[in-house]
């Protein structure tokens, strides 16, 4: 099936998911510079918050260089055509955080839950719709649920008022057939006017292929990040995805060369380490582990001498999900004790 002429919305993640590899330490000037570049390149939607969403600043998730309010206040006035979104995880972000974001000019709120827990999003989705926001239900770790189970959860979020639903490959574990099955069944189940999106990670180098599969199956919003700046091996690299879309005739409205310049000249220079598919990031995708666990596992390796890969495999075995970052330390300690017993 030809996708030529299909229009999609690309949504940049480099200033939100990109907070994870930066340990939430992106400066206000870096935020402004990258946001201006994305805006000029034609990116229509840019996400800006702590890596774990509004209210994410904590011992568990990490303290950012600046508050969400400061980041949003720095970026929003700089934009000429792009709009700003914010992520909110119920239990981390509150309705007061949501109101704050709205007052500062955020136009899109993405309410994120684990893929089996859509019922905890009702209050936040309902308020976002009442405030007139573009309201997105964001189902994380979607590889852990069957297409049929995702349909049930997506319809719950739609019933609460979400005008767009996201199928989110938080672990970068899916292959194109997995994406096709989930996106197509959810697309068939939702109202025709409800939009559908896909968020990928590049932990098996499938970010671009999975995103194209999502578009072919009916998604019209696709997350990506300039230079792939995001958790794990990064998000779908925006400049590559836009170039592939251009080759296929999919209309993104983003200039290929301009977004490539943003990636190369603005994003790559702020990386603490190259965003690449190393053995630990590969393990995230292979074992189906939440991408933002990568740095936690590397810190545990440095502290306890247990290889990060072994820790990540154990986290996958335990089927840990976002919000259980404290269990990474527990898993590492258990492995240390087991090693001592063997010795």
UniProtKB/Swiss-Prot annotation:
PROSITE patterns associated with the record: PYR_CT
The keyword Metal-binding appears for this protein: yes
Leading EC class: lyase
Molecular function in Gene Ontology: 2-isopropylmalate synthase activity; 4-hydroxy-2-oxovalerate aldolase activity; manganese ion binding
UniProt-listed Enzyme Commission number(s): 4.1.3.39
Keywords assigned by UniProt, alphabetized: Aromatic hydrocarbons catabolism, Lyase, Manganese, Metal-binding
A Pfam family per the record: DmpG_comm
Single biological process term from Gene Ontology: catabolic process
Protein name: 4-hydroxy-2-oxovalerate aldolase 2
UniProt lineage: Bacteria, Pseudomonadati, Pseudomonadota, Betaproteobacteria, Burkholderiales
